From Swiss-Prot:
Function, in words: NQR complex catalyzes the reduction of ubiquinone-1 to ubiquinol by two successive reactions, coupled with the transport of Na(+) ions from the cytoplasm to the periplasm. NqrA to NqrE are probably involved in the second step, the conversion of ubisemiquinone to ubiquinol.
Pfam families in UniProt: NQRA_2nd, NQRA_N, NQRA_SLBB
Membrane-crossing residue ranges in chain numbering: none
Protein name per Swiss-Prot or TrEMBL: Na(+)-translocating NADH-quinone reductase subunit A
The gene coding this protein: nqrA
Keyword Lipid metabolism: no
Broadest EC class assigned to this enzyme: translocase
Enzyme Commission designation: 7.2.1.1
GO molecular function: oxidoreductase activity, acting on NAD(P)H, quinone or similar compound as acceptor
GO annotation, biological process: sodium ion transport
Subunit structure: Composed of six subunits; NqrA, NqrB, NqrC, NqrD, NqrE and NqrF.
Keyword Transport on entry: yes
Alphabetical keyword list: Ion transport, NAD, Sodium, Sodium transport, Translocase, Transport, Ubiquinone
Amino acid sequence: MIKIRRGLDLPITGSPRQSIEDGPAIRSVALIGFDYHGMKPTMNVQVGDKVKLGQVLFTDKKTVGVKYTSPAAGTVSAINRGERRVLQSVVIDIEGDEAESFKTFSEAEIASADRQALVDNLVDSGLWTALRTRPYSKVPQLDSVPNSIFVTAMDTNPLAADPQLVIGEKSAAFALGLAVLAKLTEGKVFVCHADGASVPTSAAANVEAKAFSGVHPAGNAGTHIHFLDPVSANKTVWTIGYQDVIAYGELFTSGKLPVDRVVSLAGPQVTDPRVVRTRLGASLQELTAGQLKDGENRIISGSVFSGRKTSSPTAYLGRFHNQVSVLLEGRDRPFLHYLVAGANRFSVMPIYLSKLFGGKKFDFTTSTLGSERAMVPVGAYEKVMPLDILPTQLLRSIIVGDTEAAQQLGCLELDEEDLALCSFVCPGKYEYGPILRDNLTRIEKEG
């Protein structure tokens, strides 16, 4: 068991009730382009086309042969593009239940099948896109083989659902999904779970369970990779979420693309925080309708630390998100706020009176209580960075765009979520996730 001691469990109100309930009916879903870094689509459909569940919507020029399939049967109602015609979303109004069929395999057939047969089934169904590489967090090339695969079967994000609720319901499908993953690599398949959790495993010899405990980011894939099989410019691993492992198992037994998604609907502005069963790419306006407190609310697909702020073209559940968080927009500017005692304010530094009340939770808003300013090294980053890197030096290097120094300091190990806590505690109010992504894009492009 690996214990994470440096990090932060955010004391935020609105934690979800840990039992799965059915969510509201969803009438529209979308596939979000921003979920796939560097993707350049070649469209197979246009607005007004009827599509089946699992039908190809587009392919990717950058990862030849990879297919992106429809998360529902219905009509393509919008193809939204932004600047430079970057794909924002493909929206589908749900209608009917027509679905594409894919090959089925028994557990014995999976064990004896060659790797290419399993890859072909994942590609045809669109579930190949559930895999992400590290470094760069991109959909892997079809001819690539990872050094190992990491299954994230725990979640330490604020307001997250307990993965054991979901895995416990579909343990057989989870185990079968692990058997599929075991055939995709000659290395280990690490199933990373919370200490004390009961997680099904596979009979495959290369599947290995690893327990983690401690504060967030103990549940991040980047943390698991750092301690178990660190990556480099010449060494790649893949990551996948626990609900996608279940989807792998269901695909190979049913021959139909699974689209169920269990998410937490939580946060200070949710009237009844709970865990709901919905579907992949669900409209967040429909999912949260009648569920929010009064006020100007920000709906976030994902964690409050590293999720995506939703706007009209992209107000849908992200491909890799297992939660929907809602915060009040922080428009107020209190007079001389820096002079208050701070009984109702939170800081990782001992500057507020609230530090004396250890168990108190706070109604966080989107306010940063200040504008962007110079980066000040006061030891805040070191308090929340559990990885064996120098966070202050790394953050400075990516701010100035020194990619050579950033690589030497370990940026290739990281994804946006791995620097989310650094953004939260930053006295300079920097958002390090987008800065890291810009640097990773340059490194990959320049070699």
